């Protein structure tokens, strides 16, 4: 096998999750569950990939959310790879953003720029329901008794 163009397309975790889910549904509907060695390997890879992706933020995304996110990212002047990492991982702290965006100190001269990027990411991309519940519980604990 030969790779013609390594960067012809970048896929987000959401796109891979949707593609594999659709393929799985199509195979189930058609009743074609081939049992060749190659097909078994493909089924295993599909299962393991879906199992992993179902535990990531992509599970709660939609085409509209991805479109809105990419539109909002235009003002931040990020590379395609950086946007993809932010979309796939949904960072929740400035440190996580600094790990995903190269040369953050030079490109974002003010702390407010990183905070604005973080706000955009956390505002548009849905959080895991468990994470949102933990965050609201921690916020209530910090407020203390009234």
UniProtKB/Swiss-Prot annotation:
One of its GO terms (cellular component) is DNA polymerase III complex. Its main location: nucleus. It is found in: Nucleus; Cell membrane. It is a peripheral membrane protein. GO terms for biological process: transcription by RNA polymerase III; transcription initiation at RNA polymerase III promoter. The keyword Secreted does not apply. It holds the Pfam family RNA_pol_Rpb4. InterPro entries: HRDC-like_sf, RNA_pol_Rpb4/RPC9_core, Rpb4/RPC9, Rpb4/RPC9_sf, RPC9. Component of the RNA polymerase III complex consisting of 17 subunits: a ten-subunit horseshoe-shaped catalytic core composed of POLR3A/RPC1, POLR3B/RPC2, POLR1C/RPAC1, POLR1D/RPAC2, POLR3K/RPC10, POLR2E/RPABC1, POLR2F/RPABC2, POLR2H/RPABC3, POLR2K/RPABC4 and POLR2L/RPABC5; a mobile stalk composed of two subunits POLR3H/RPC8 and CRCP/RPC9, protruding from the core and functioning primarily in transcription initiation; and additional subunits homologous to general transcription factors of the RNA polymerase II machinery, POLR3C/RPC3-POLR3F/RPC6-POLR3G/RPC7 heterotrimer required for transcription initiation and POLR3D/RPC4-POLR3E/RPC5 heterodimer involved in both transcription initiation and termination. Belongs to the eukaryotic RPC9 RNA polymerase subunit family. PANTHER family: CALCITONIN GENE-RELATED PEPTIDE-RECEPTOR COMPONENT PROTEIN, DNA-DIRECTED RNA POLYMERASE III SUBUNIT RPC9. DNA-dependent RNA polymerase catalyzes the transcription of DNA into RNA using the four ribonucleoside triphosphates as substrates. Specific peripheric component of RNA polymerase III (Pol III) which synthesizes small non-coding RNAs including 5S rRNA, snRNAs, tRNAs and miRNAs from at least 500 distinct genomic loci. With POLR3H/RPC8 forms a mobile stalk that protrudes from Pol III core and functions primarily in transcription initiation. Pol III plays a key role in sensing and limiting infection by intracellular bacteria and DNA viruses. This is DNA-directed RNA polymerase III subunit RPC9.
